[in-house]
Amino acid sequence: MRVPIENRIGKEGEGFGLAQTWINAGRIRHGARSLGVMERCLELAIGYAKQRKTFGVPLAQRQSIQWPIVDMQMDAHKLRLMLHHVAWKFDRGEDCRQEAFMVKIFGDERSFWTADRCMQIHGGMGLSKELPIERFFRDQRSMMITEGAIEVLRMALARMILDVK
């Protein structure tokens, strides 16, 4: 298809570079969305763990509940810091492909894991449509495919890091 010159975005031959910039922005947004899911899952898991009792003891006092919540909190903090860094580089117009890949891979994988753990903490209620957890679980699984499948991004990131073809 021929595009009239007045409708061209950028200069001739620079389309791929522009597309990479837009794709990087999408991967950064993936990370931000993943962080939002992680934070909401944490709120739900913490609230439920404090309220729900089994055998007279709140779930929050059980190590099998505490440790995943700690890991969820640490992962959210890591992703938040990664997002600040990649957004800073992106805003400055610096090359941030590696960081954008890492944010997408880490964010998608860990937000899916967080939704899974939140679902597990809630037991059967985590599967119900009354709570947003089952939707987070499904949505975050699909995020690992869109804007670049995480396996492909991991392979491309390895090539960048190792400087191999």
Regions found by a protein language model. Give the residues of each.
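Short Ser/Thr-interspersed hydrophobic loop/turn segments at strand-loop and sheet-helix junctions
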Residues: 1-3
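Alpha-helical interface subdomain recognition
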Residues: 5, 12-165
